[in-house]
């Protein structure tokens, strides 16, 4: 999902900065790392991982790594839906919330999938094909300050997706 997120971001801008958790953080919610130092490792220019949570990653990026606040924070692409009560457990959604709390337009992206017959494989085709198409109109909208958007791509192949609906 992370490679798909980068591909989507590159369709929107050439000025991409990445800071993500070094390890899987499913179910991390809006937690912070308080019991140990958060370590940052640089992998390339404008590309880091940190030993903390998704929220730690956002805080580290905007507070320490970037020279100025970004125009946009994208979080995801999460494996699975972030709908209903699940959003409260989601590190993906919480990273976007942290960005919004910092006054930055923030969008969480998730790819819904069906586990039946797929094992651990998540088809990110819908997110990959539709990501930038969904984000462009969202970015053109006026948003109230400290607002985040949560996008879920359906469990369909990219060509089976018929369009976009904002709810």
Where do the language-model regions lie?
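Short glycine-rich anion-binding loops that position phosphate/pyrophosphate groups of nucleotides
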Residues: 24, 53-54, 78-81, 156
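Glycine-rich beta-alpha junction loops
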Residues: 22-23, 113, 152-157
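N-terminal beta1-alpha1 ligand-phosphate binding loop
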Residues: 1-10
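Electrostatically charged, flexible surface regions
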Residues: 122-167
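A cross-family phosphate/adenosyl-ligand binding-site feature
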Residues: 9-64, 68-69
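Short, Asp-centered acidic motifs that coordinate Mg2+ and/or phosphate
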Residues: 72
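Glycine-rich phosphate/pyrophosphate-binding loops
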Residues: 100-123
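Glycine/threonine-rich flexible loop motifs
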Residues: 81-90
């Amino acid at each position: 999902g992370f490679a798909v997120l980068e591909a989507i971001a590159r369709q929107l801008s050439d000025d991409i900065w990445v800071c993500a958790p070094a390890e899987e953080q499913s179910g991390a919610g809006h937690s912070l790392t308080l019991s140990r130092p958060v370590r940052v490792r640089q992998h390339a220019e404008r590309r880091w991982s940190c030993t903390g949570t998704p929220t730690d990653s956002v805080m580290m990026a905007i507070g320490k790594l970037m020279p100025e606040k970004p125009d946009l924070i994208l979080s995801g692409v999460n494996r699975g839906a972030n709908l209903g009560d699940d959003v409260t457990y989601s590190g993906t959604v919480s990273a976007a919330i942290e960005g919004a709390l910092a006054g930055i337009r923030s969008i969480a992206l998730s790819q819904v999938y069906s586990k039946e017959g797929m094992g651990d494989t998540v088809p990110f085709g819908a997110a990959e094909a539709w990501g930038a198409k969904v984000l462009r109109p969202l970015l053109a909208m006026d948003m109230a300050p400290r607002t985040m958007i949560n996008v879920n791509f359906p469990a369909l192949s990219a060509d089976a997706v018929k369009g976009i609906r904002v709810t």
